[in-house]
């Protein structure tokens, strides 16, 4: 059987239009089929089907050549990386005129991309956003099934953004996407590292492996004059700065030795009305007021300013954040006739719960009532830690279901309960709507109710099915706001 070098296939793609497929059911005569390795189902199993449907070339690993039949095998070590190379040629994404800014980290990605979008729109730019809530650019918007799209979909989106005259793109880059090479073939003008706290350890072996997945955004996607910024207020950001000396740091602590350039921030005041911050970078000092609350949002604002200064903006441009009202499902206030302080937030990790509950605690609410749960078929080790965070910072803990998926909600709740040992008051109710109703009945003026875990989501996954469910809609229905 004749083999074909990858370079030759790339030359063929440059000369003529050949469809690239990763799903054998979509194969057309003369196309390229890339057999992606998988954790549950391996793409190599579908090579015979792709060949029978007319695939001309099969990108595969050495041990899969025997299945290629009449198709020409392209043997590679990493089919996922190769897919990105081919997609870059097919969609011409190597010649994009718009800069792409990638944001990675456990928490803060969505808020940072929204803040960047708001800032650059205020400057008159046509912006694109790819992230947890939506994929959107001028003339297009759709709900996001994945934080970071699959490789072919991502290249197709970027190509369309270019056609639609998008001028700058802000992209959330998840650890899954980095591990699975979904962003292969993409050149980033700038990258941001926010933080790293426990999450996704059902996927990554441990925190070290989780960190190395995130760090790939800094190491494996080189581009000319790449801007790299990272928080120095957490150990993982400082570790990253040791590995990448060019990083520009930001934080509220004194400048660490790992970085030569550092955006230093101070919180001058924090209240229910918002934040008053002071920043200094090199010889410049400026202040900023915003309706956003919480230290975590102050950190998000530092990240945005750190990279924006490198993209040519000036401190006076940041005054637009005085009118920034927030992100859907991120400490989102539910306005109601009873004037109760009710918030919905996406917090679904121990650290995210600590951040949002601390923000509410710091602005002086009398009591904090928290409705929360843990997702099924996800990192079980974080469940008691989430309970511990809620017990420490809430007056009433209402434990319920999140997206139970294929686990028994009662068993998920049982995993959380050890962390709630020191809670002042515990209510358990697996039915999420009933749990929210019980929590609302407990709220008095001066209290804060936080409904955590689902944020912007409009479905609840039970088993393999997704059912319509929105925390915001449920709250409004209970309060008669609809």
From Swiss-Prot:
Its EC number is 6.3.2.13. Keywords: ATP-binding, Cell cycle, Cell division, Cell shape, Cell wall biogenesis/degradation, Cytoplasm, Ligase, Magnesium, Nucleotide-binding, Peptidoglycan synthesis. Its cofactor is Mg(2+). The keyword Membrane does not apply. Pathway: Cell wall biogenesis; peptidoglycan biosynthesis. It comes from the Bacteria. A motif (Meso-diaminopimelate recognition motif) lies at residues 402-405. GO terms for molecular function: ATP binding; magnesium ion binding; UDP-N-acetylmuramoylalanyl-D-glutamate-2,6-diaminopimelate ligase activity. It holds the Pfam family Mur_ligase_C. The modification N6-carboxylysine is found at residue 214. UDP-N-acetyl-alpha-D-muramoyl-L-alanyl-D-glutamate binds at residues 24, 147-148, 174, 180, 182. GO terms for cellular component: cytoplasm. InterPro entries: Mur-like_cat_sf, Mur_ligase_C, Mur_ligase_C_dom_sf, Mur_ligase_cen, Mur_ligase_N, MurE/MurF_N, UDP-N-AcMur-Glu-dNH2Pim_ligase. Carboxylation is probably crucial for Mg(2+) binding and, consequently, for the gamma-phosphate positioning of ATP. Catalyzes the addition of meso-diaminopimelic acid to the nucleotide precursor UDP-N-acetylmuramoyl-L-alanyl-D-glutamate (UMAG) in the biosynthesis of bacterial cell-wall peptidoglycan. Belongs to the MurCDEF family. MurE subfamily. This is UDP-N-acetylmuramoyl-L-alanyl-D-glutamate--2,6-diaminopimelate ligase. The lineage of its organism: Bacteria, Pseudomonadati, Thermodesulfobacteriota, Desulfovibrionia, Desulfovibrionales.
């Amino acid at each position: 059987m004749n083999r074909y070098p990858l370079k030759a296939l790339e030359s063929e793609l440059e000369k003529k239009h050949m469809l690239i497929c990763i799903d054998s059911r979509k194969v057309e005569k003369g196309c390229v089929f890339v057999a992606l390795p998988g954790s549950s189902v391996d793409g190599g199993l579908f090579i015979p089907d792709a060949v029978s449907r007319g695939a001309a070339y099969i990108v595969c690993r050495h041990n899969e050549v025997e299945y290629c039949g009449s198709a020409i095998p392209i043997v590679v070590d990493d089919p996922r990386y190769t897919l990105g190379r081919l997609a870059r040629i097919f969609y011409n994404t190597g010649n994009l005129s718009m800069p792409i800014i990638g944001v990675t980290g456990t928490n803060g990605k969505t808020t940072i991309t929204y803040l960047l979008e708001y800032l650059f729109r205020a400057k008159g730019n046509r912006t694109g956003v790819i992230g947890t809530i939506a994929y959107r650019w001028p003339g297009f918007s759709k709900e996001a099934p994945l934080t970071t799209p699959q490789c072919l979909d991502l290249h197709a989106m970027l190509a369309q953004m270019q056609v639609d005259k998008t001028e700058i793109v802000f992209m959330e880059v998840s650890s899954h996407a980095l591990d699975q090479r979904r962003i292969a073939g993409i050149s980033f003008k700038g990258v941001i590292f926010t933080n790293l706290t426990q999450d996704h350890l059902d996927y990554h072996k441990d925190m070290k492996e989780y960190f190395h997945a995130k760090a790939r955004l800094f190491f494996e996607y080189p581009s000319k004059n790449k801007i790299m910024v990272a928080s120095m207020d957490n150990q993982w950001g400082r570790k990253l700065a040791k590995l990448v000396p060019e990083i520009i740091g930001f934080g509220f602590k004194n400048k660490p030795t790992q970085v030569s350039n550092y955006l230093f921030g101070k919180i001058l005041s924090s209240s229910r009305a918002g934040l008053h911050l002071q920043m200094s970078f090199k010889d410049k000092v400026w202040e900023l007021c915003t309706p956003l609350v919480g230290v975590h949002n102050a950190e998000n604002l530092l990240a945005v300013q750190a990279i924006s200064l490198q993209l040519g903006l000036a401190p006076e441009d940041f005054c637009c954040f005085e009118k920034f009202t927030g992100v859907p499902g991120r400490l989102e206030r539910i306005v109601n006739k009873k004037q109760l302080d009710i918030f919905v937030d996406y917090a679904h990790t121990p650290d995210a719960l600590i951040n949002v509950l601390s923000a509410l605690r710091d602005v002086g609410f009398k009591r904090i009532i928290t409705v929360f749960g843990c997702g099924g078929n996800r990192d079980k080790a974080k469940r008691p830690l989430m309970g511990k965070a809620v017990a420490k910072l809430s007056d009433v803990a209402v434990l319920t279901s999140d997206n139970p998926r294929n686990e028994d909600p009662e068993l998920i709740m049982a995993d959380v309960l050890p962390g709630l040992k020191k809670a002042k008051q515990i209510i358990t109710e697996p039915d999420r709507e009933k749990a929210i109703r019980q929590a609302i009945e407990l709220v008095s003026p001066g209290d804060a109710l936080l409904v955590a875990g689902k944020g912007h989501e409009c479905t609840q996954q039970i088993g393999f099915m997704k059912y319509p469910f929105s925390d915001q809609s449920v709250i409004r229905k209970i309060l008669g706001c609809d």
